[in-house]
Structures are given as structure tokens and as C-alpha cells.
Amino acid sequence: MGAVGKLFTLCASTVLDPLKRLGSVVISGAFYSPTDQEQIRMITNFHKTARVRSKPSAPARWIYDNIGFDLYEGTLDYGCGRGTDARYFGIRGWDINGGEHEPLDRYDKFDTILCSYVLNVIPSENERMQVISHIKNHLTPEGNAYLTVRNDKKNLNGWTKSGTYQTFVDLPLPIVHKTSGYIIYKLESWFNLDKPEEYMNEV
């Protein structure tokens, strides 16, 4: 179980590296050789997408202001980047614990999981759904995850000016907040990802 009153962090490189095992799960669904793994890293440049920010992201501020009261106990920042959002929550009284590069134990469960700007850098829809499934598997029975993706189609057509890969993502999940620049989706632990029609009408 996730420790009460703590915010855990997991950096994007740990989430996305095909050779990393998150618990007992291999995100890619297959093993890649070191050469293939390096090619994937070079092709997508996902390790360069974590921005250096002096302020927390807009989704982090919105989540704290609107649903933060649900997030205090057993929270994981899944793909925390440089940790700016985690520090933002820590200043506001959350006990931040866990190294940025620590993989999850297969039995770790969290009341809430935050995943911001991670899914846009995964080229494969199949692998994006594997990441979402992995997040779902680490929720407590009453847990929720909030998945933030960029929604500016003009700048999500593959390559950015900084040489990183970003793709437009439309998830089969309920939307809790949508604005210019990003969308926040909600994933509940009971959702059957193979049958979105069962939960899209219930939320």
C-alpha cells in the first residue's frame, strides 16, 4: 500500500524506458536490445521533454485548487520530470517521498496517481494504453488517476522546434477539465479499458 500522507515520484525516463521493469511489467510489451533502446531514445528524444520550470504546471495548479482535497494520502506523480510539480505540492504540506528513478513495486497502490504530459511523447497507441493500464493497476480500489495531455494539434504533429517528439492524444476516458493547451482525463480503478462504453456513460 502507498504510505499515508506521502507523495511519490516516478520520472518520465523510468516510465518510458523500454528496458525498465515497473513492478513486474515491461511497458513495451517486449524486450529491446540496448542498440534498439538507444535508437528509440534518439528517435523520440523523450528524455528531453521534461521542461525546466520555475513554477508548477498549469494542470498541477488546477488539480490542487479543484480536487486537491482528494489527493493528500498515497499520491504518486507518475512521470514527474524535474520534480517542479512535486515540490509545489510539498510546499503545501504534502510529504514528498520516493526517488525520481525508483521503479514501482508490483504491490504498490495509491489513492491518486497524477500523470502529466507523459502520454504525448509515446509514439505508439498500444504502448500508451499499456502505460494507462499500468497506472490503473497501481490504484487502490477507490483510487483515481488524472492524466494530462497537450491538446494543441498544430504543435502536436510529431516533431517540435526543440527536436522532441509530441503527438496528439485522444483518450477514451472522461474529461474533468479542458482548456487551451491541455486536457485532464480521469481514470478510475474500476474502469474496464477494453470496454470504454461501460464507464463513459456512468461518470
Model-derived features with residue positions:
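A short glycine-rich, Lys/Arg-flanked "PGG" loop and its adjoining helix->strand segment in the class I
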Residues: M129-P141
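Intrinsic, low-complexity polybasic segments
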Residues: V4-K6
